[in-house]
Amino acid sequence: MARRPKGRFIDGIVLLDKSTGMSSNFALQRVKRFFNANKAGHTGALDPLATGMLPVCLGEGTKFSQHLLDADKRYLVTAKLGERTDTSDSDGEVVQTRAIDFTEAQLLTALDFFRGETQQVPSMYSALKYQGQPLYKYAREGIEVPRESRPITVFELNFIGLEGDELTLDIHCSKGTYIRTIIDDLGEMLGCGAHVIMLRRTQVAQYPYARMVSLEQLEALVAQAHEQQIDPSILLDPLLLPMDTAVADFPEVNVPDAIAPYLMQGQAVRVPVNAGLKTDELVRITLGDIRRFVGIGTMNEDGLLAPKRLIVIHDEPAETD
């Protein structure tokens, strides 16, 4: 008999406010432990230098993490002008120092270059892989490997301020955009060089900034629960967002209770849907009058709703540590 996973079955999404200096995986494991969750996964790593929103999916919520990985992001970034580093951030070594000599008009013109749809060559100090190995491992050995440019979209690039040699920007961008690369390229366009000294992710998809919670806050709630001699879940679980918020922008298809069992067994079913849905378009599936979220699917060529990823409804508790 297969061993049940350790931890409890708890489904949802935590909007973690990651602190600087820690890896995203370290933060993920801490969240998983605080919630005593049987399963957890994050939705796109933040560099150790970076802070801010890191959605952590728990339990069945991990099935929808890819959709948050693909979502738009927003960042607040501060760049130090006049210095270029080998990593394009303050964790690297300064490789060039130049005078800062540009006008406000030149800065605004340079910023406009990055708005809209462009091509970006990823930094060597990234987790993208070349022949099975992350680029940053090659970079640490002083090896430069070929990288293809990738299409990105900068929906907004707002000038926040320039104080001395520090430039602050607000950037709303598509998935796969490297803010460090934007700053490095901007520094070269201005002729002075630049690197990131502060990077904070302020938004993922449409998740509210105000719902973020730090590891310190989670730890304090666990300590409070122990003092009150109550289960930590009583204080922690209200922080969870429903897992269907990861696919909130998908059109909803509601399945009547009478045919729900067939769908949950993986069968394609015929349901009344909006005529505007396209074949193979991803949809959010709900059941019955209470519109309970059970997963995502697509409409096939025969007009049937085909389940693609369904949640598991657990009847038994998982093992505890």
UniProtKB/Swiss-Prot annotation:
Keyword rRNA-binding: no
Catalytic activity: uridine(55) in tRNA = pseudouridine(55) in tRNA
Active site residues per record: D47 (nucleophile)
Keywords recorded for this protein, A-Z: Isomerase, tRNA processing
Enzyme class: isomerase
GO molecular function terms listed in the Swiss-Prot or TrEMBL record: RNA binding; tRNA pseudouridine(55) synthase activity
The EC number(s) this enzyme carries: 5.4.99.25
Function per UniProt: Responsible for synthesis of pseudouridine from uracil-55 in the psi GC loop of transfer RNAs.
Family affiliation: Belongs to the pseudouridine synthase TruB family. Type 1 subfamily.
Record-linked NCBIfam families: TruB (TIGR00431)
HAMAP family: TruB_bact
Full protein name: tRNA pseudouridine synthase B
